[in-house]
Amino acid sequence: MAASTSTLTAAGIDLIAIGQLDANGGDKATQTAGALENGLPGNLLGGVGSGLTHAHGNTFLATPDRGPNATAYNSAIDDTTSYIPRFHTFKLKLKPNSAEAALPYSLTTKLKKTTLLWDRSPLTYASNGAPSLNDKRTFYFSGRSDNFDPSLPSTHPLNGRFDPENICVSNDGKHVFIADEYGPYVYQFDR
């Protein structure tokens, strides 16, 4: 039997532009603007590197991490907060730079929309962990690492905690798939 071999391939990577976001005004989910446990606003715009995907044209979707947890307040739960996970819709526009510029393009970014992540079925949370925005038909996820029912297995499909780590748009463009670092999950959400 012949031994199989695999060939490693590499692709060159070129930095072509650097963009910036103005995080001072927060994201578009103004209903979450109240202070989190660590004192930061619940609609802080940042950390959008957990997932980025091209949707179409110059539209991109990005997932922030489970919320702002760089401000220490409770190391027992990794300083995670009750931040409601979300994804953002951005317009990114490249414009050619002059030949003398350090990078070939400049990048303009504009936040168009913020979509909070929720389920129609009641999610399970730790005691007193349900987000205050929940209503009879909308159950929001939470970025807090201890916001789950410990009596249920970690594979429980309605676990209320969620740490988004990737995003992909469906072929029809109507849905997104988002992976969860807290469990072996990939969720489908409407756009």
Regions found by a protein language model. Give the residues of each.
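Sequence/structural signature of beta-propeller domains
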Residues: A2-R191
